[in-house]
Amino acid sequence: MSTAMNFGSKSFQPRPPDKGSFPLDHFGECKSFKEKFMKCLRDNNFENALCRNESKEYLECRMERQLMAQEPLEKLGFGDLIDGKSDKN
């Protein structure tokens, strides 16, 4: 007796992400920014709100090197940091 089940001819069709791909940084072009961001997270008990500047710099690096799609910083939630303003005092 066969134990294989056939649920019809429908198969899973993968769908690309809405924002496009997020390629790996194989050449370490943004490694220093990533490490600075991760250090900030560790130093601040993983409270990401305290590391927004580091996060912004990391994403800017990725966009400049075509490692992610170009997006306005306002759309990524960094509108208040564009003019050098920061919640960190």
Curated annotation (Swiss-Prot):
Cx9C motif 1 (motif): residue ranges: 30-40
This protein's GO CC annotations: cytosol; mitochondrial intermembrane space; mitochondrion
Pfam families per UniProt: CHCH
Signal peptide (UniProt feature, chain positions): none
Predominant location: cytoplasm
Span of domain CHCH: 27-69
Record carries keyword Acetylation: yes
Modified residues (N-acetylserine): 2
Location in the cell: Cytoplasm, Cytosol; Mitochondrion intermembrane space; Mitochondrion
Motif Cx9C motif 2 in this chain: 51-61
Keyword field contains Acetylation: yes
Entry's Gene Ontology BP terms: intracellular copper ion homeostasis; mitochondrial cytochrome c oxidase assembly
Assembly description: Interacts with CHCHD4/MIA40 forming transient intermolecular disulfide bridges.
Family indicated by similarity: Belongs to the COX19 family.
Protein name as it appears in the record: Cytochrome c oxidase assembly protein COX19
Organism: Bos taurus
